[in-house]
Amino acid sequence: METTYGRTYFHASAAGREIALQMAVGPLPPPVEQYPVLFVEIWPGHPFPLGASFEGTGTNFSIFSDVAERVELCLFDDRGVETRVDLPEQTALCWHGYVPNVYPGQRYAYRVHGPYDPSHGLRCNPQKLVIDPYARAFEGQVRWDPAVYGYPLSADDLARDDRDSAPYMPKGVVINPWFNWNGDHNPHTPWHQTVIYETHTKGFTKLHPAVPKSLRGTYLALCHPAVMQHYHDLGVTAVELMPVHQFIHDHYLVDRHLRQYWGYNSIGYFAPHNEYASTGQLGQQVNEFKEMVRTLHLAGIEVILDVVYNHTAEGNQLGPTLAFRGIDNGAYYRLSPDQPRYYVDYTGTGNSLSCGTRTSCS
């Protein structure tokens, strides 16, 4: 990264450029030399929509935070090397910037500078990489390390931990929004004729002998011909999927060599869970999910999603700082009115989203 005449420049991701080209012209031959270094600048961009929006020749980034004093966009190359650039504008409490030559496949996250005062419900800490709540795709999972917590584990949550969490965090991924839906539409089966089949994306096909091993337990397995025939034999008109938006495996489960199997531990509401993809996590999961929906719809089968909008995977005040907590804790969560250090917990999950605010409902 370098700064020239007040403008900030950084190196674009080689993987992002390759994926964008593959989407346009098909698979590329192995490169015979390294990609040239590209220098691009950040422009003001626009505040809406939130998230990372690829616009053909670059990407607009926007994130909401009422309490932030400064927001850094963090871009990661194929080696995990991080480049930081300040989002230059703030409009309607959204920090935003447009970066030319950032393509689908680019990994990104944020660092939010602002007050760290847990006793007043403020938990900004720029040493903690925070993922975009509006990301459409993620690569990787949380690798549990003390650095992903906003406070030292040897102290209480009022103290601030300044270890960098980036090496242990998943990253958001810029996606290409284009997909050939071939005129797809919801079958709109009348309710009195609806037969719903509830299932789990992984468990339903993980051991299915008629599904290729490379597809078992994935989105594409849900629309494999053998599975489609099973739906029709049962008279199914709608498939209801247990949580498929991005979730994490809790620390205490991983310590016991277990997994968050059911998925009720959301961290990315706009992103299909990456571990259910068969071909990759740099946006491929989005296209596979869309292909599954399109195929089921073509067969007259509706798709219903089981969603988890009451809480997130960040838990209570002793949980990790992954996204919402480090971006704008009080805007996204319901805090105790008398002691905003603590979270209102209606369901025994550690926190409750503040669903009465426009921010959480957007």
Predicted feature descriptions by range:
Residues 72-74:
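Beta-strand signatures of extracellular beta-sandwich domains
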Residues 57-61:
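Structural beta-strand segments of beta-rich domains
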Residues 10-12, 19-55, 82, 90, ...:
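The feature marks proteins involved in alpha-glucan
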Residues 165, 188, 200-362:
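Substrate-binding/active-site clefts of carbohydrate-active enzymes
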Residues 62-64, 98-100:
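Surface-exposed loop and edge beta-strand positions of immunoglobulin-like domains
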Residues 65-70:
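Short proline/glycine-enriched turn/loop motifs at strand-loop junctions of beta-rich domains
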